[in-house]
Swiss-Prot record:
Its main location: cytoplasm. Gene3D superfamilies: HUPs. It comes from the Bacteria. This is Phosphoadenosine 5'-phosphosulfate reductase.
Length: 244
């Protein structure tokens, strides 16, 4: 696979960037998740970062990337509305995996946001998008800038939702390379990896949660529901971090 010039690729229209990365992505599809991480670390520019929501399967990508690149900055965008179990899971994994955790938050506290805007998550798609912009997108953009990131790893999988079904292993988002090492993994592969390495699902998985975000926009899975319907009242799947 040829070397990739981030600056040159960023000058191209989005469609042309996709085409420019097509050959590389075709080859990355043939590699294992570990090989994809190793390739990215060898061929893509640093600084390198890994983002995590510390959701249901978070231990997989955190363990996989961190064992190959110890001390990689792990970005968490904390809304202040995560489940208590999520905060406990963050502490547990940070200690167990010796994570270099970097927590980013909105400039306004949750209480101040509610005083200023009301409960944005109850204000339809527009309100949810504004909430996500304040609490997810802006803090992530700030994290990428402050950490001088040029290559960003994330744990998305195609099986999780229709909006992720056609994502490539390698793309450019927010001006940096974005690598999705486990994009083609199914639920069985995730389970097997967790078992092999003595890792756990998020504590709420045992209570029927397939996806975990904020307390006010996350629902338990019920028969007949798609996984994406358990988030944002079924109005949206993505929080904004992985769009654009």
């Amino acid at each position: 696979m040829s070397q990739l010039d981030l600056n040159a690729l960023n000058e191209l229209p989005k469609v042309d960037r996709v085409l420019a990365l097509a050959e590389t992505n075709a080859q990355l599809e043939t590699l294992t998740a570990e090989e994809r991480v190793a390739w990215a670390l060898e061929n893509l520019p640093g600084e390198y970062v890994l983002s995590s929501s510390f959701g249901i399967q978070a231990a997989v990508s955190l363990h996989l990337v961190n064992q190959i690149r110890p001390d990689i900055p792990v970005i968490l965008t904390d809304t202040g509305y995560l489940f208590p179990e999520t905060y406990q899971f963050i502490d547990e994994l940070t200690d167990k995996l010796k994570l270099n955790l970097k927590v980013y938050r909105a400039g306004e506290s949750p209480a101040w946001q509610e005083a200023r805007y009301g409960k944005l998550w109850e204000q339809g798609v527009e309100g949810i998008e504004k909430y996500n912009e304040i609490n997810k997108v802006e803090p992530m953009n700030r994290a990428l800038k402050e950490l001088n990131a040029q290559t960003w790893f994330a744990g998305l999988r195609r099986e999780q939702s229709g909006s992720r079904a056609h994502l490539p292993v390698l793309a450019i988002q927010r001006g940096v390379f974005k690598v999705l090492p486990i994009i083609d993994w199914d639920n069985r592969t995730v389970y097997q990896y967790l078992q092999k390495h003595g890792l756990k699902y998020h504590p709420l998985w045992a209570q029927g949660y397939l996806s975990v975000g904020d307390t006010h926009t996350t629902r338990k899975w019920e028969p007949g529901m798609a996984e994406e319907e358990t988030r944002f009242f079924g109005l949206k799947r993505e929080c904004g971090l992985h769009e654009g």
